[in-house]
Amino acid sequence: MYVDEKRVGDEYLTPYSNDYNEWVQYQTYDVTEEVSKQGMLRVLLGNGWYKARFGFSAFEDKGFYGNEWKLIAELHLTYADGSEEVIGTDESWQVRRSKIAFSNLYDGEHRDDTLSELPLEKAVFCEAPKGELTERMSLPVTIHETFEPKELLHTPAGELVFDMGQEFTGIFKLHVNVPAGTKIHVQTGEILQRGNFYNDNLRSAKSEYIYISDGTEMDLVPHFTFYGYRYVKIEGIPDLKKEDFTGLSYYSNITATGWMKTGSDLVNQLISNVRWGLKCNFVDVPTDCPQRDERMGWTGDAQVFSPTAMYLEDTYAFYAKYLYDMAKEQSVLGGKVPHVVPSCGVEDAACVWGDAACIIPWNLYLFYGDKSILEDQFVSMKSWVEYITKVDGDNHGWRSVFHFGDWLALDNPVQARSRSWVQRTRSLLQTCIMRSAQESWQKRPVC
């Protein structure tokens, strides 16, 4: 959002990632300093999680939740005489295509500054998303660190590749001064192979930025995508210099609370790697990876890592939002906890993964001592245990359905599945956690 040419706030990727069929977050900003009598309010809309391909339907070129750009906004004005006015989105607002021709969380962004500016047209009313408009729970996603390239590599394949010296999640700033019509192609990757740029591990994710210049010298910054990367391949700038590029690391606004330093450089590097693994995967949702065509909130990953995350950072609000979304998903799935949250249409459940509904709230209580999270999530915890009990029935049906095992373990005779004793012990653990949670919250024994 902009007032005249000034960007409002410092957040990226709003309104963030959650089940848009159940709830839609709104954000508020103080624009007192930006607003003038002749000020123009502008909002730039991208595909985001709502309209772009995402999740396990990622090979389909359509959004899971919808295929329209939608905006609901209000400008609240209080005048010097005390009178108030609210200017809301309606058909008096005007729209037109921007210079951003394409955006996608997996595939990147395309910007073409040679596109002619189209005339303004009246906005039209559209059907609202299914979810209830809800005050934000997501922490702001903002830039926390910047990185300068450690080296400009000339690879054996003749490529120009920046080595940032550090893997991180975020975007970049690229200074360009090239003739009109020049095409600049930026690609990101995590490793080199035989000294050359490599990104085949990203599967279908293109993870790129394409720019067509109109000849204006400027700094390019992507708006509606993010990358997980260390290496950056750039084509179209023959006199490329290290000072032209800056890496911008962003993630949710969490605060470091735990530190440890040892006498071993290897152990210290391991601790640093763990913390950076957290930062890279805490972009609004606790994800499995920040770079390939997935980047989803896997519940098993989230619960296993949650104690470590709570030692390192203040993650209470971050996980509270994730759990709220999880409970919303359960409310329409009969208590079932999907493998990923938001589910993006995935309705399967399994032990360990679904156990996040009980384990994460309990860990939040143990680490932060706030019993309200147990009260807030108790229906979610209880419905998960009841779902397991229902599926198990009199014939131990819970043991016969698919459950993830040690992923790609070569000694597991049943592919990626776990053995039945795992389901039995995990079910007992969730029941014990739920019982302890209710006793802690209600301050009395329960039956």
PLM regions with names:
Residues 107, 207, 287-289, 333-357, ...:
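The feature captures the catalytic groove of carbohydrate-active enzymes
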Residues 257-263, 307-310, 424:
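Second-shell loop/turn segments in exported
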Residues 1-292, 300-301, 317-320, 337-345, ...:
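Extracellular/oxidizing-compartment recognition motifs
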Residues 275, 279-283, 324-327, 362, ...:
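Amphipathic, well-packed alpha-helical segments that form the structural scaffold of globular domains
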Residues 180, 185-192, 261, 378-390, ...:
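Acidic, mature catalytic/reactive cores of soluble proteins
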Residues 237-245, 267, 311-323, 327-334, ...:
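Structural helix-adjacent loops and short alpha-helical linkers that scaffold large soluble proteins
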Residues 270, 301, 322, 357, ...:
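Stable alpha-helical elements in mature extracytoplasmic
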Residues 298-304, 311, 354, 427-431:
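An alpha-helical repeat/solenoid feature that recognizes helix-turn-helix modules
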